[in-house]
């Protein structure tokens, strides 16, 4: 019965589609779309974007800003071979490589030795201080000894698992194999020494702090894995950015370690050339301007701490464009990005359904008395969550509509639905408008003929969305809403700061803003920032900081366009470049109503996504040329 209904529905849809294609209305839409498309292609904007500016690349300023990378290349030419040879022959480095390979393989003997060493050290320290031993650790020792008897790579069983194959197929990772370790390093004694050393360290740390001690083997593995394969650090950063909810410092640590690992690899390879294309010069100038404003800040130390976080997350762009050098890596990273976003969105939906840790602190209770809940998931604030989802949603949609395998298509369309529902539940009006901007740009450049469908869909929106959502939408710009009037008063006060400090700014961060803003505030409104990213950059770094940020965005869209125009129309590459650019545009639109860089993790994701898109654009451009 169900199959008959589905078949009838598909048949009706096909009939309507064919009738519409043959209609005069479709012919009129085709003609209008063709005229607009030709006009855009011949416009001044398009011609300006197509123009290659080699003078900028070869300018003195560009060479100065890129001199650290030039210096690294010169050093690698002189010492690359010697350094690589020493690392290859080093016993310590061999221990590290063996640890990584056996941990990836989940070698039973290796894990048994590590757990046994940890158990013995922990109980020795426990007995020495208290006179007692932990019986559970004794049981772990017995189990560990049993594992030592066998020498099996447990991860190898994943290759033959039907469940694992099904999951890989659903997520679009069919080519990923679980035999990624070096078999030669899963035999011999040196791996056991490596396991025992980490086990001893784990046992000692566990005696002081059990929770931290348990994390030691994983932390050591992660650090050594990134040191051996720096690209894994990029994947880890993209996946973990929204999930580590308690602090931005772990993410900063991953980014710093990945950059250091990349530098070490570049020094060991005399043929390594740092990629300089894209927004690199503008990003470094942006950091330089903000550094100067921080040095002369009203709260110097606070500003320098904020600048240090900016430095880490902005320079991570260079790790992305240098390590993501193939389409497989780029799309693998984008899939990881979408999966991470789906987990964040799913948790947000569960917050709404089960009422977990929700609050009405972000709702004007007088104007929206029936609304009591806005979800924020792992990002502590509904607006921040919405800003993150604005970047995720276009990526997941493109993965859904362009996937060739039906099951993979279904999974990423489901991911898109989850992310979209969570975006609605944030009740962030600015983010809703940002998504509309993203959708409008994507439809216009992907296939303008979709506008008819989009307009029809918009006509049904009032009948589908709940009254609470419609009330929020209709309240946009209403000064009776406290959140709207609050922002307007903050902007008025911020403009007072700009008028007095437009050249150099007041310095970065809340500390400097808190010292200066009260002198210009309206209606005694207290605020930690200006609720507008462009205004905030103008306040913190003056006109030079805002100019550099606009330059970054301009270069980003220029690189995106250069990649887009060499791609086949409606291909996966062109759709993804367009999707990411649309997401960034929606994010920038929301930036007019909130300080979107206030949350470091969202700021990090923004610059990572810029790096991914520029890397993908470079890949398709080089392949074409």
Residue ranges of model-derived segments:
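Hydrophobic alpha-helical transmembrane segments
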Residues: 542-553
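Long extracytoplasmic/lumenal interhelical loops at the membrane interface
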Residues: 469, 477-492, 496, 500, ...
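Membrane helix-loop boundary segments at the extracytoplasmic
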Residues: 125-130, 239-247, 538-541, 572-615
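Alpha-helical transmembrane segments and their immediate interhelical/interface regions
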Residues: 298-321
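Membrane-interface catalytic loops of GT-C/OST-like multi-pass glycosylation enzymes that act
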Residues: 301-305, 379-383, 426-430, 527-535, ...
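Flexible juxtamembrane loops connecting transmembrane helices in multi-pass membrane enzymes
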Residues: 158-170, 367-375, 431, 458-493, ...
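Alpha-helical transmembrane segments of multi-pass inner-membrane proteins
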Residues: 109-155, 188-208, 216-223, 258-259, ...
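Transmembrane signal-anchor hairpin modules in multi-pass inner-membrane enzymes, especially those
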Residues: 1-292, 298-305, 325-331, 335, ...
